[in-house]
C-alpha cells in the first residue's frame, strides 16, 4: 500500500459525494469520497491527511508524457521482476511510490533505475485517512 502525506486544497460536493483535491510534496491528487463536509467534519480545506492507494492502481508512462490526469513525477529507484508481474519502486518528492505492472508493459516502457517516470492514480483509487493529533 502506498501512503503519501497531503493536505486538502479544495472540496466539491454533490449528492453525498465529494471530489477532494489534495496537495502532496510531489503534486496534486484527487480522491472520490462518499461523504461530505457536513457528514464528515474532518473533510475541510487545510486538513492534513494521508493519501492511500494500492500498488496495482498506479499507472506509469515515460517521464514528460503527462497524458495522465492526477499525475506525479518520479524517478525509478528499483525494479523487481517476477514471472508475470514486476514491482517498480519510484522516488517522488512526497516519498516512495510503488507500482505493480505486468512484465509486457514493463518491457514496452523499457525502464531502468534512474529513469524519469510519470505516475498516475485514478481518483476513485485514492483513500483519505485523517491525521490524528
Language model regions located:
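Glycine- and charge-enriched low-complexity intrinsically disordered segments
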Residues: 82-97, 112-115
Amino acid at each position: 500500500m502506498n501512503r503519501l502525506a497531503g493536505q486538502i486544497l479544495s472540496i466539491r460536493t454533490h449528492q453525498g459525494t465529494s471530489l477532494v483535491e489534495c496537495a502532496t510534496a510531489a503534486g496534486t491528487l484527487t480522491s472520490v469520497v462518499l461523504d461530505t463536509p457536513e457528514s464528515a467534519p474532518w473533510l475541510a480545506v487545510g486538513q492534513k491527511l494521508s493519501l492511500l492507494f494500492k500498488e496495482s492502481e498506479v499507472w506509469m508512462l515515460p517521464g514528460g508524457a503527462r497524458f495522465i490526469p492526477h499525475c506525479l513525477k518520479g524517478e525509478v529507484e528499483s525494479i523487481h521482476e517476477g514471472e508475470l508481474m514486476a514491482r517498480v519502486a519510484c522516488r517522488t518528492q512526497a516519498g516512495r511510490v510503488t507500482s505493480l505492472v505486468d512484465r509486457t508493459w514493463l518491457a514496452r516502457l523499457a525502464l531502468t533505475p534512474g529513469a524519469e517516470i510519470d505516475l498516475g492514480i485514478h481518483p476513485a483509487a485514492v483513500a483519505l485517512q485523517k491525521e490524528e493529533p
